Amino acid sequence: MIVVKIGGRVVKNSLDKVILDIANINDKVILVHGGGDIVTDYTKRLGIEPVFVTSPEGIRSRYTTKEELEVYIMAMSLINKMITSKLCSLGKNAIGITGADGGLLLAERKKRIIVIDERGKKRIIEGGYTGKVKEVRSEVINHLMKLFDIIVVSPLALDVEESTPLNIDGDQAAFAISKAVKVNVLVILSDVEGVLVEGKVVDRLTPEEAKELSKKIGPGMNRKLLMAAESVENGVNKVIIGSGVKDRPVSSALELNGTVIVNG
C-alpha cells in the first residue's frame, strides 16, 4: 500500500497525468489531494476575499473563517469527486471521502495562532477553523481497503469536541495516515523535482540528515522534511519527495527520482 499526496498546484496544472499514472499502478493507493488555488478561485467568485497569514517561521497559510470553511468544503468535495470519477472511468475501484467521514481524521481546532502582522510584529489572533490532526482511525482505512483499490481523501478532519469539520494541512493529513497504517511508501508530489540545495536535487537522506537539513531550507519544504523524518522513524519504509508535473509522476517517484528519505 502506498500513500500519494498531490499539492494544489499539481491539482490545478497536472491532475490528469497523476490520475492516469495512478490508474496504472499495481498496488493499493491512498491519494490525499490539496487544492488551495481552486479554493481561492471559488472564494473570490462568491465575493469573499481570502485571507492568508504568515507564521513566525515564515510559513504562509490560509486563514479559515466559518464562511470560508463552507467554501473550502465545497471546493475540496468537487476536486475529490472529479478525481474519483476519473479513476472509476478508467476502470479502477475507487472511493472518495474526506478525513471527517467515518471520523478518519480527528483533530483539535487551533484556538489561537501566532502570526506576523503587516508591521512585522508577532500577534496572537483567533485560530479560525483550522485544525491539527490528533488521531487517525486506521480501522476506517483498513475496512475501505478491503472493498476498494484506491481511496481519495480530502484534507478535512473532524473536531469531535465542537462537532465541526476543520481545514487541515494536506501534508499533515498524508503523513498522519501514512504513520497510522504504516505504508510501504509515501510519495509527496509538488511543482519541484525534490529537495533542492544550491539548485541541485538531494537524492537521499536519512531521518537524521533530513532533520538537520530542515534547519537550512525555506518554509514549506522544511516542514515536509521534518514530517518525513518522523514518518520513517515511525514505521513508514520510505518517503519520496518528487515532481508532480512530469509524465508518469508517481511511477517516476517510485523509481526513486526525487529526494528519498529512508533509514540507513
Curated annotation (Swiss-Prot):
Write out the annotated subcellular location. Cytoplasm
Write out the catalysed reaction: [amino-group carrier protein]-C-terminal-N-(1,4-dicarboxybutan-1-yl)-L-glutamine + ATP = [amino-group carrier protein]-C-terminal-N-(1-carboxy-5-phosphooxy-5-oxopentan-1-yl)-L-glutamine + ADP; [amino-group carrier protein]-C-terminal-gamma-(L-glutamyl)-L-glutamate + ATP = [amino-group carrier protein]-C-terminal-gamma-(5-phospho-L-glutamyl)-L-glutamate + ADP
* Sites where the protein binds substrate: G35, G36, R62, N167
Pfam families named in the record: AA_kinase
In chain numbering, where does the site feature Transition state stabilizer fall?
Answer: K5, K224
Extract one GO BP annotation from the record.
arginine biosynthetic process via ornithine
**Enzyme Commission (EC) number:** 2.7.2.17, 2.7.2.19
Gene3D superfamilies reported in the protein's UniProt record: Acetylglutamate kinase-like
Q: Which GO terms describe its cellular component?
A: cytoplasm
For this protein, what is any one GO molecular function term? N2-acetyl-L-aminoadipate kinase activity
Q: Name its pathway.
A: Amino-acid biosynthesis; L-lysine biosynthesis via AAA pathway; L-lysine from L-alpha-aminoadipate (Thermus route): step 2/5; Amino-acid biosynthesis; L-arginine biosynthesis
Q: Which keywords accompany this UniProt record?
A: Amino-acid biosynthesis, Arginine biosynthesis, ATP-binding, Cytoplasm, Kinase, Lysine biosynthesis, Nucleotide-binding, Transferase
- Top-level EC class: transferase
Superkingdom, taxonomy of origin: Archaea
Q: Does the keyword Protein biosynthesis apply?
A: no
- Role: Involved in both the arginine and lysine biosynthetic pathways. Phosphorylates the LysW-bound precursors glutamate (for arginine biosynthesis), respectively alpha-aminoadipate (for lysine biosynthesis).
* Family, as annotated: Belongs to the acetylglutamate kinase family. LysZ subfamily.
Instruction: Quote the protein name from its UniProt record.
Output: [LysW]-aminoadipate/[LysW]-glutamate kinase
Q: Which organism does this sequence originate in?
A: Saccharolobus islandicus (strain Y.N.15.51 / Yellowstone #2)
Its lineage opens with: Archaea, Thermoproteota, Thermoprotei, Sulfolobales, Sulfolobaceae
